[in-house]
Amino acid sequence: MIDHSQKRYAVIGGDGMLGHAMVRFFRKNKKEVIGTSRRSNSDERAVFLDFAKEDSWGNILNCTDAIIVGGITDYWECKNNPDAVFINEQCIPKLALFLSKHNIRVSFISSNTVFSGSKPWPKENAPHSPVLDYGQQKSNAEQNILQMTYEAGTKDLIKIIRPTKILTMDTSPLPDWIKAWSKAQKVDTFKDLIVAPITLGYVVKCLSTIVESKESGCYHLSGSENIDYFNLGKLLAKALGYSSSLVNKTTSIEAGVAIPFLPKYSGLGMIGTTKMFGIESQKIQEVVKELCK
């Protein structure tokens, strides 16, 4: 039986953007944490774990809490790679079940793409309506995890957490925008691409609050408003000291760019999450301010 009096965190997928940030946050706050990787050339402190290799799962049985961040997340790969369904819908739920049977609390990082984006601010318990392969795989993973752990009597150890779009200054197309603006060149931005962005700092801090609690359930982390890339570009340009005249408005269709997911609404309702943890959605002004630090 795991001793929960001394928390030990395992970030599964600790070499990805979010996973790496989670590991750094826990270490900075003097928490005992390990990150996992299936790559041999990763951080020397990383523990080997491969979703498809069940004999590697026992490598983290000394943890009390596991955060499943990894998986196949690229939209196009989820659509075209047959392994995506196997990893995302079968292996990850089986891993969550395995860990829960060893009395380890499991937080599964899902996505706002379990919803179609046709309705604003879906609540934590709203019915799923995915239109994207990636969203369908996340939806199926959620349902498989909950069903399998319910049958095993370990569902009370499971948390599902859905963030909206996480932005950093390295998130495409922001680096290209900034490079162009620095040369006084205009950029084309898409009016039909809607996001409810949150920053890496916000999501990591909020995730740590949720993960460290004993509360099971489904929770949302979202930006406070739906904003298109044209208006996001104008806000960002202004914050960086560039003229908003350098931000052109177009659409992905007009630009001939194939974007797999164009939701009308991207934001998530956070009523249940706010009530449970006091976590509020992140205002767009805070997003831009943090990005421009």
Labelled PLM ranges:
Residues 48-89:
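NAD(P)H-binding glycine-rich loop region in Rossmannoid oxidoreductase-like domains
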Residues 206, 213-259, 265, 292:
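Mid/C-terminal beta-alpha module of Rossmann-like enzyme folds, strongest
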Residues 189-194, 219-226, 276:
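Glycine-rich Rossmann NAD(P)(H)-binding loop
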Residues 2, 7-29:
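N-terminal Rossmann NAD(P)H-binding glycine-rich loop of SDR-like oxidoreductase domains
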Residues 143-195, 201-202:
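NAD(P)-dependent short-chain dehydrogenase/reductase
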Residues 83-94, 128, 132, 136-139:
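Glycine-rich NAD(P)-binding loop of the Rossmann-fold in SDR/ketoreductase-type enzymes
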Residues 94-131:
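Conserved Rossmann-fold NAD(P)-dependent oxidoreductase catalytic core, especially the SDR/UDP-sugar
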Residues 246, 261-293:
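C-terminal amphipathic/interface module of NAD(P)-dependent oxidoreductases
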